[in-house]
């Protein structure tokens, strides 16, 4: 992820889900990255009790410095009716990555995550990372007997694609990743290993050299239904575009 961590981006996502059961498939802070989380209670009558749980690439609880205080992987807070909570993670220190789960009990939760990397004399760039509801590996939850997702990629003309996976289940996952070019020809494939509650992210060409100079479609098939997938398209000028997967 060192190449991805050098990319400058700001990410924001909002998805309204009753009781806020879901997750963010990629989070990062430190190493110049600042991360913000904002959770809104859309219920005008009921207080929401919210929990954010953070996990590292190996599925272990990830200590996080939230609002100046380090917590041991789990942060509990409440949101008043029609209220909101803003959480901040600093840009200083060593870069850290993983994924985060949001659960709210009572009220009606909506999640928002922000990442920013500020470079003096250069504009901030933006992209979107979604809050994914439980039971779906993508923002558009289309059920399938074997969970399968299609994600576009573009590594042509100086563009670069990064991809992230989050295993939100308590069992190991072994997703199969296949890359097809625009003619429909299979150019690369591999099976990944994700530990329980684990996470992985990488530039596509780091694991699939055949993707260099190509564009097409990434097909991800998972052996369990609780693997979230997300891709980011990095343009030559540093601008980031989120490539949301679609269920098949």
Regions from the PLM with identified roles:
Residues 19-248:
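Gly/Pro-rich, tryptophan- and cysteine-flecked surface segments typical
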Residues 7-18:
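Bacterial N-terminal signal peptides
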Residues 1-6:
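Positively charged n-region of N-terminal signal peptides that target proteins for export
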């Amino acid at each position: 992820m060192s190449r991805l961590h050098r990319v400058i981006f700001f990410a924001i996502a909002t998805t309204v889900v009753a009781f806020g059961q879901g997750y963010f498939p990629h989070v990062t802070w430190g190493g110049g990255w600042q991360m913000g989380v904002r959770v809104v209670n859309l219920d005008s009558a009921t207080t929401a009790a919210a929990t954010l749980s953070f996990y590292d690439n190996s599925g272990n609880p990830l200590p996080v410095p939230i609002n100046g205080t380090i917590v041991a992987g789990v942060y509990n807070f409440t949101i008043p009716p029609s209220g909101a909570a803003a959480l901040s993670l600093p840009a200083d220190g060593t870069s850290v990555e993983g994924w985060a789960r949001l659960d709210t009990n009572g009220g009606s939760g909506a999640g928002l995550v922000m990442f920013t990397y500020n470079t003096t004399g250069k504009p901030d760039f933006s992209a979107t990372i979604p809050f994914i509801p439980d039971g779906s590996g993508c923002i558009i939850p289309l059920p399938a007997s074997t969970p399968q997702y299609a994600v576009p990629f573009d590594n042509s003309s100086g563009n670069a694609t990064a991809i992230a996976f989050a295993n939100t289940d308590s069992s190991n996952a072994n997703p199969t990743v296949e890359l097809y070019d625009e003619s429909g020809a299979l150019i690369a494939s591999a099976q990944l290993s994700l530990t329980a509650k684990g996470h992985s992210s990488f530039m596509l060409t780091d694991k699939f050299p055949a993707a260099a100079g190509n564009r097409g479609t990434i097909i991800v098939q998972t052996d369990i239904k609780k693997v979230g997938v997300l891709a980011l398209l990095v343009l030559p000028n540093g601008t980031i575009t989120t490539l949301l997967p679609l269920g098949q």
